[in-house]
Amino acid sequence: MTPEEFWKAVNYLNVLGARQEAGLVVAGLGLEHYLDLLMDAEDEQAGKAGGTPRTIEGPLYVAGAPLSEGEARLDDGVDPGVVLFMQGQVKNTAGEPLAGAVVDVWHANTGGTYSYFDTTQSEFNLRRRIVTDAEGHYRFRSIVPSGYGCPPDGPTQQLLDQLGRHGQRPAHIHFFISAPDHRHLTTQINLDGDQYLHLSLIHI
């Protein structure tokens, strides 16, 4: 490595931090996914295999979303998007319903941006925590999110361009699921019909 290459790398890291894209580049390069693989291996060695596979968290989670019992509305009604209804059931690895589990859900708006980071949105828009009912069920109303890409003028996209890779993600929804005496689950789903459904920038 030459001194010029070394300082170019240092300057890149400075720009990455200034643009607050460190969490984006580690996800885009697969480093965060590698962390999941390490934790999966540790769980398997400890005899804790089974259940829904974990996926990456990503850099856009915000703690403290409003808590609801059984059901919630995620959107604030400002964004005229397509209405989305989703329901599910939380179960343990034996297939038994988990009452009182907390489903922490968040996603982007129709413009592909997230509340808190996009200050034009209301606080905790498209972010809620839902406590499952006696049968482990939860449900929510929201709007269909949009996919999005890395900022085109940012350091992450600059690196991806040099690697010959796009920076796009399909529309998706994030989940944290937790319950007493159970492992915390981080997962997400991609929405069917998106052109990047099977071509996402990020391995989840």
Model-derived features: where do they sit?
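Beta-strand-dominated extracellular/periplasmic modules and repeats
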Residues: 1-201
